[in-house]
């Protein structure tokens, strides 16, 4: 084969896909359709179960053609350390229109299996430390921010503002 013939062949790689669509079951409170945070939570659980590490979710408006089926402003990349391992987000409305979904917004995630396990071996595993003399304090803070504020930007701002005092920053609600 020539180099040109190899470039014409489809690129196949093992991937793990997840699609959520419809009404999520609710054991308390109001029911609602699956959203970005539902698929993100499941992906984080899978990656943590497989690698022991929590992936970083970063917004990305420059995803390549391979992710053109995702909504351009409702998608993100997944990383372990600095290594990309997948994408997640809302399926593009033009793509969803080809299926009988009504006004539902399908949520999709795809993990590159090879990249996931390669990154898990490169990224150092967390080390155990001695328990602190003074126990940690958990704070639940409510913030009102402009609707155009990206979750990753807000998280980065909170981490920077806390300096070394915050062990973890976790955004958990959107109103």
Region annotations inferred by a language model:
Residues 6-17, 24-175:
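A carboxyl-terminal module marker
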């Amino acid at each position: 084969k020539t180099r040109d013939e190899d470039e014409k062949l489809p690129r196949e790689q093992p991937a793990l896909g997840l699609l959520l669509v419809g009404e999520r079951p609710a054991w308390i409170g109001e029911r609602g359709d699956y959203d970005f945070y539902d698929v993100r939570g499941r992906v984080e659980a899978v990656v943590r179960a497989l690698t022991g590490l929590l992936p970083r979710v970063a917004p990305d408006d420059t995803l390549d053609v391979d992710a053109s089926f995702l909504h351009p402003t409702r998608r993100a990349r997944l990383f372990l350390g600095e290594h990309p391992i997948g994408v997640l987000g809302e399926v593009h409305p033009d793509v969803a229109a080809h299926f009988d979904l009504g006004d539902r917004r399908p949520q999709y995630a795809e993990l590159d299996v090879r990249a996931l396990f390669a990154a898990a071996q490169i990224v150092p595993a967390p080390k155990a430390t001695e328990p602190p003399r003074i126990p940690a304090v958990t704070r639940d803070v409510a913030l009102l921010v402009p609707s155009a504020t990206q979750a990753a930007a807000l998280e980065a701002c909170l981490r920077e503002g806390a300096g070394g005092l915050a062990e973890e920053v976790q955004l958990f609600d959107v109103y």
